């Protein structure tokens, strides 16, 4: 392929996608719904997209007290074009005062971020980001290094491999914690409580950014319409939500029989009296899944330093590894 003068990333808009051939299948409405600050594309002489990425320098995470910019919506059919787009994104973020670039990240960790770096043999699962092996290489070729690591783990035998509870069930019973499926007749009230738990539980997490209540509902309400309420359990105590676990079926198995749930999110209020509640929620979720005919559970996209990964490792094995990359823009 001839990489001549056309490899110059240009600013691009959602409307421009209607004028080109896009083999990456980008959903251009994401530029507005995910509030990208700028978008770049490399178009070849045949009017075909070779690479694209967006940048965010507003409402992004902090890292070591410094301002961070992020590079997301990345795709490339050609590494030379992809790396040109990444370098243009870095130049843009530097010009807007960012000390560090993170990627891939669509603005913040509420949206898609991370690359698969160790694929394993298992097929993709529901809500998992995916990428060709070449895309992380494009970032490292531009000077990025892994900043944080994440894993997904799989338990092929949820009937016999579950977290140990010891006396935790009795502890929660004595406290008066009640666990039940989300209230489908008043899911808005439960979602408000879940939002409060998420904000309290994750506020000290790595690269956390606040999310308003309405945007949180926008993420979860469409998912709730698809799943059986037994796969979203809510823990309540003294009239408020104190924890939850969300584990939709692996809908990417629809071409064959679905036998797997994806434990996507669980969170507990950071109060010592609720220590161990996460394990109880997971066990109750696995019991529900078994009753519904599921046999396998994926613990999805866990930071390797998080307690959720420690709970998962008791009964699940390695499946996939991911990384988020970073590069200083000040040196």
Residue ranges of model-derived segments:
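Acyl-donor binding region in acyl/amide transferases
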Residues: 64-143, 256-315
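Short beta-strand-to-coil "C-cap" segments at the C-terminal boundary of structured domains/repeats
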Residues: 155-158, 326-331
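A conserved beta-strand-loop-helix scaffold within acyl/acetyltransferase catalytic domains
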Residues: 6-45, 51-63, 181-268
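Short hydrophobic/aromatic beta-strand or adjacent loop that forms the aromatic wall/cage
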Residues: 37, 148-152, 319-325
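Acyltransferase donor/substrate-recognition loop-hinge adjacent to the catalytic core
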Residues: 129-206
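Conserved hydrophobic/aromatic beta-strand scaffold that supports enzyme active sites
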Residues: 73, 152, 232-234, 244, ...
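Generic recognition of stable, solvent-exposed alpha-helical segments in well-folded globular domains
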Residues: 81-84, 134, 189, 193, ...
């Amino acid at each position: 392929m001839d990489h001549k003068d056309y490899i110059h990333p240009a600013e691009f808009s959602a409307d421009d996608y209607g004028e080109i051939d896009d083999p990456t299948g980008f959903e251009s409405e994401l530029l507005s719904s995910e509030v990208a600050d700028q978008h770049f594309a490399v178009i070849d002489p045949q009017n075909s997209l070779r690479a694209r990425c967006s940048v965010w320098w507003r409402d992004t995470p902090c890292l070591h007290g410094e301002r961070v910019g992020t590079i997301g919506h990345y795709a490339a059919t050609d590494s030379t074009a992809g790396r040109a787009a990444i370098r243009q994104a870095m130049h843009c973020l530097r010009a807007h005062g960012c000390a560090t670039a993170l990627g891939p990240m669509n603005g913040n960790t509420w949206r898609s971020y991370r690359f698969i770096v160790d694929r394993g043999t298992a097929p993709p699962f529901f809500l998992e980001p995916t990428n060709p092996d070449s895309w992380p290489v494009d970032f490292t070729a531009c000077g990025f290094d892994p900043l944080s690591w994440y894993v997904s783990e799989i338990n092929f035998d949820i009937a016999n491999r579950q977290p140990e509870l010891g006396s935790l069930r009795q502890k929660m019973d004595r406290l008066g914690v009640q666990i039940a499926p989300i209230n489908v007749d008043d899911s808005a009230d439960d979602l408000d409580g879940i939002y409060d738990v998420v904000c309290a539980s994750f506020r000290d997490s790595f690269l956390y950014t606040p999310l308003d209540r309405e945007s949180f509902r926008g993420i979860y309400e469409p998912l709730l319409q698809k799943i059986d309420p037994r796969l979203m359990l809510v823990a309540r105590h003294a009239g408020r939500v104190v924890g939850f676990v969300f584990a939709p079926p692996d809908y990417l198995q629809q071409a064959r029989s679905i036998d797997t749930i994806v434990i996507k999110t669980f969170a507990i209020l950071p109060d010592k009296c609720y220590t161990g509640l996460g394990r109880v929620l997971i066990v109750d979720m696995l019991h529900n899944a078994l009753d519904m005919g599921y046999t396998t559970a994926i613990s999805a996209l866990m930071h390797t330093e998080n307690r959720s990964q420690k709970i998962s490792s008791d009964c699940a094995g390695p499946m996939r590894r991911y990384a988020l990359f970073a590069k200083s823009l000040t040196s």
